[in-house]
């Protein structure tokens, strides 16, 4: 359940209270079990928010496939989301729910449109995130559902950190080249989410960084190029790579044109995002 670590931790610094100058960064951190409806109701009602940004999720995709984990994954991604949506309805506040391209079947080459309803999740994670989406859209009118992909940021585990660590200890690495998408930098995403909740332009959106669609192989090559690594990157197919318990989408292309159409600023190029991110990692090390 790492969603709040990866994205939520970048939200507070991004938000300074546009309406009244009140800094969210001064608000206390409260640990909350979103699977407990009574606790969710009490904690959120005590705050009386104008908007709730729901980042918490079970994101361990392969572990979610374990028979003894499925109920827990569903309790978090679907049940917890329903609890939050119910409180938002009672309080008449906005809700923003972060979701994923995994709600689709991951096939083809055409970018997925935000308002596409051709849902065919490939795995338990995708199915439960879809159930979370439906909980929000069927409960509320004032909601944003924002799908993202290939997330990386300062906190939590992510692909960039993993490949940097692997590159330090291996002369060569094998990376899949037939899964296509675009990375999302949490620092950039947080600023977009703030803009969204200050608006009333509700609905479904896709939000990844700009710069076109790439493979994990392409991403790794750029990570090593910018980091100055000499590690050789070998492209392989998903079938050749193997190992994954949960099915992965080949097509994670998300169409983001609705953002601009509704007046939102697109996220910067992913290569620029990666450059800034690597710079921050060095500064913090």
List PLM regions with ranges.
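NAD(P)H-binding glycine-rich loop region in Rossmannoid oxidoreductase-like domains
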Residues: 34-76
């Amino acid at each position: 359940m790492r969603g709040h670590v990866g994205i939520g931790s970048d939200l507070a610094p991004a938000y300074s209270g546009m309406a009244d100058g009140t800094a969210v960064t001064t608000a206390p951190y409260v640990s909350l079990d979103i699977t407990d409806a009574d606790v969710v109701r009490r904690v959120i009602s005590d705050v009386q928010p104008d908007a709730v940004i729901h980042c918490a999720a079970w994101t361990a995709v392969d572990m979610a496939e374990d028979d003894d984990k499925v109920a827990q994954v569903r309790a978090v991604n679907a049940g917890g989301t329903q609890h939050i949506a119910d409180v938002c309805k009672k309080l008449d506040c906005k809700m923003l729910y972060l979701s994923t391209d995994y709600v689709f079947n991951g096939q083809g080459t055409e970018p997925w449109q935000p308002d596409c309803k051709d849902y065919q999740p490939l795995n338990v994670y995708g199915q439960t995130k879809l159930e979370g989406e439906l909980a929000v859209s069927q409960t509320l009118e004032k909601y944003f559902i924002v799908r993202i992909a290939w997330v990386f940021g300062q906190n939590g585990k992510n692909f960039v950190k993993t490949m940097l660590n692997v590159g330090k200890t291996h002369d060569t690495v094998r990376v899949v080249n037939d899964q296509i998408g675009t990375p999302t930098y949490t620092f950039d995403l947080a600023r977009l989410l703030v803009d969204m909740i200050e608006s009333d332009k509700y609905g479904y959106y896709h939000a990844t960084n700009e710069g076109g669609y790439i493979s994990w192989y392409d991403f790794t090559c750029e990570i090593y190029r910018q980091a100055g690594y000499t590690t050789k990157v070998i492209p392989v197919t998903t079938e050749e790579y193997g190992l994954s318990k949960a099915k992965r989408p080949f097509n994670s292309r998300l169409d983001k044109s609705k953002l601009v159409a509704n007046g939102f600023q697109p996220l910067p190029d992913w290569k620029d995002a990666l450059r800034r991110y690597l710079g921050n990692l060095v500064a913090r090390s």
